[in-house]
A protein has these predicted regions:
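Nucleotide/phosphate-binding catalytic cleft detector across ATP-hydrolyzing
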Residues: 1-75, 83-185
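Conserved Rossmann-like nucleotide-cofactor binding loop
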Residues: 78
Length: 185
């Protein structure tokens, strides 16, 4: 934490900064206090703890103070936060440890199983970002993916469709959708 504060401020500051830290919606008060204490120890003057779905809603331009419910699904790298927000606070929420990194791993497994192709996490993430889909789309996109052929050990290029990414991500997506349903109930 201290490293990031110094990196953001450089050597030009004389005052300790005010810092907002985002935490997943499911963290306990003890965990929030630990994050707050660590931030103070790293050099903060003032610390605000904000739940990630609230920060995501504000970042998306949603007026969270209104008396209407807004569902936020924040899929990060390591966790996904699902929340219903109204009147400036969280009405109901859930946080699961299934997120973007799991999508990448699912794509790596799919490419290995379906195409006998070994690809790295970076290639999987690139594929996810460029043509990844969690539902069948009217227009199918394609991308050439390079990796190592697991049979010959030689480099190989495979043309992958957005339909294949939907298949690769189906199970992981279903777990997030299941959590969305539980939040709505």
């Amino acid at each position: 934490m201290k490293y990031f504060i110094q990196k953001a401020l450089g050597k030009r500051t004389f005052r300790k900064p005010r810092i907002a830290v985002c935490v997943p919606s499911g963290v306990t008060e003890v965990e929030k206090k630990a994050v707050e204490d660590a931030t103070y120890q790293a050099g903060a003057r003032e610390v605000s703890i904000i739940e990630e779905p609230i920060a995501a809603a504000i970042g998306a331009g949603i007026d969270i103070s209104k008396p209407c419910g807004n569902m936020i699904v924040d899929i990060g790298g390591g966790t996904s936060d699902i929340a219903v927000i109204s009147l400036g606070g969280t009405v109901v929420s859930a946080s699961i440890k299934i997120a973007g990194d799991d999508f990448d791993e699912a794509i790596v497994r799919y490419m290995r199983k379906k195409h006998n192709l070994l690809i790295g996490e970076r290639t999987a993430e690139d594929l996810k970002i460029k043509i990844g889909s969690c539902y069948k789309r009217a227009e199918v996109d394609y991308m050439d993916v390079r990796g190592r052929n697991l049979v010959t050990g030689l480099p190989k290029t495979v043309k992958v469709s957005s339909e294949e990414t939907e298949e690769a991500l189906r199970e992981t997506t279903a777990q997030i959708v299941e959590t969305i349903h539980s939040v709505l109930e």
